[in-house]
Amino acid sequence: MKRDYGGVLEMATRANSMLHGLSNHIEQQRQEFNQTGFYQTFSRNAVANMPLLSKHAVVAAIGDMEAAGYQFGKKQTGSTSQYALTIQNVVDIYQHRKVPKYRDRHDGPFVVFVVSLKGGVSKTVSTVTLAHGMRAHPSMLHNDLRILVIDLDPQASSTMFLSHTNSVGSVLETAAQAMLNDLDADQLRKQFIKPTVMPGVDVIPASIDDGFVASDWEELVA
């Protein structure tokens, strides 16, 4: 007979079931209403007002790209069809215009470290907002930034925000495990870096099990 440690085991089992159910429900709704991608799109005029572009430049770029077979996002408004340009569409317009990206102008990554030992000071909200804003803000799109969020908090709140399917239950491919196993870049890309709903923003998840790394540190690294 298993011990339930004063009801803790039963509570944990129920919580795990509820979290899986909630995650599955969210995913089913997104599939049902075709909301599997990032929601934000831009009109052609909105793109024309972005840095280093103009109405003439955007119209010319779209014309050239469509003539070459490129397909832009569109939406139906009454009897007319209007451009609904995705983040990738805008990035491709900049590339067609030969606007240099951040990585063309700078060597290596730019690191932002968000940390506080105190809880409830908006570490997660700040991190996720920075990641989304630096990728998707109209004034930043010409940089075509590739964002990687490395979640080192065992609560996995940032992972939940960015990729809820990787935040429930025991997750083996976490940032803490990557450090413990001293993996190379190829292994990290293939096994640990997970895509999020926003193209260009990826995450290395955290898991509740990471909370035990500190207490087992000596045994793990011996």
Give the ranges of each region predicted by the language model.
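Short coil turns linking two alpha-helices in DNA-binding domains
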Residues: 52-61
